[in-house]
């Protein structure tokens, strides 16, 4: 289960912890509403920083500017550097209750995540859409190596491309 975020007696329950790199915003068409997002320096240093979703900020900082404040999360302290722009609920989920950590910080703080069957997602957007197949192939090769998948065995992970996502959506909606 996801730990609570605590500040000065207030607490909020995030629904997802996201370990990210700076390109996450572009790859997922998201923006910060206040402060800044995680940068390369944060990732390199495994900085103890956190970006919180709009609902998390609203719950624990109702009358206080959250930027620069320190919160407790998962037994560690993190400086709030940003608040995500309010997204609201979509057909799939609401990201307003997500929290974001540098990927290196996430790996240190939550090493058990993948081992307990929780998903790890990697999102990327090619600069040239015609390169999607090449990027999928390269990503597949890297993941197989990192995960130790033998040559003669199937992938132990999935890759979702825009075409597959649209196909899944059409299968569910009958469109």
Features from the language model and the residues they span:
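Membrane-proximal extracellular/periplasmic loop immediately following the first transmembrane helix
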Residues: 1-2, 118
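Membrane-helix entry/capping segments
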Residues: 130, 143-175
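Short active-site oxyanion
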Residues: 13-15, 157
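Mid-to-C-terminal secondary-structure elements
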Residues: 18, 22-42, 46-152
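A short acidic, helix-capping loop that chelates divalent metal ions and anchors anionic groups
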Residues: 3-8, 88-92, 167-169
